[in-house]
Amino acid sequence: MTDKIDRPLATVILAISADGKIADAVRSPARFGSANDKAHLEQQVAASDAVLFGNGTLQAYGTTMRVISPELVKQREQQGKPPQPVQIVCSRSPQFDPNLRFFQQPVPRWLLTGPDSRHTALPSPLKNGQDAPSTRDEFSCGTGILPVHKRLIENGATSQFDRIIYAKTAGGEIDWIDAFQQLANFDIKRLAILGGGKLVASVLAAGLVDELWLTVCPLILGGADAPTPVEGEGFLADLAPKLQLLAVKQVGQEVFLHYRVDR
């Protein structure tokens, strides 16, 4: 039973179209949410110790959602937290485009992957001849990020991930119970999950999602190939996770739905 293991409280936060899509059929970055939705997402991220998202989501956006509001940064500091939550990329392969803006953002970066990745080279966004950032700039300890000279050394190269978590795998897929237990060992108590649909499906199937925030946006995307909040193999109706509606809030033309997953 997942309620008996030490793990973070996990909340899925997604914006969806009125017909339940999180992106269009060609999987363009989903930027159809309003400024209100973006502010809501930032609030949820600010309330979390870490943010989890899949490699596909990272490739689509190239960046991650960080806390920008001075008020929210101050709230985190008053709670004894670093200015930014940990940003965790989940990927079976550690191969990334080293020039993604994500690797220049002033956030702590972790990689969650399987044991088969241990001997694969990890990305460093520093181009040939480019100097490493000074420990006084965005990589300083004051931002909760390891300075370059303390970053991980993997396969003889400096990785731009501050920590790599090697979770157990089953059938080539991440063992999410093991992964969540490892996150708890690193004092991650609240986890925000931002997609994509395959990752959400895997964590939900493992019984590890506690709450969902869905922003219903006023557009129809359609398309049989357009991704949905929960992909994977799906659930039979009799075995589908049941939800309890906690709150409904309309802001402008959007509706914010807050659910708890029944155990």
In which residue ranges do the predicted regions lie?
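Enzymes that bind and transform nitrogen-containing heteroaromatic metabolites
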Residues: 1-121, 125-129, 137-139, 145, ...
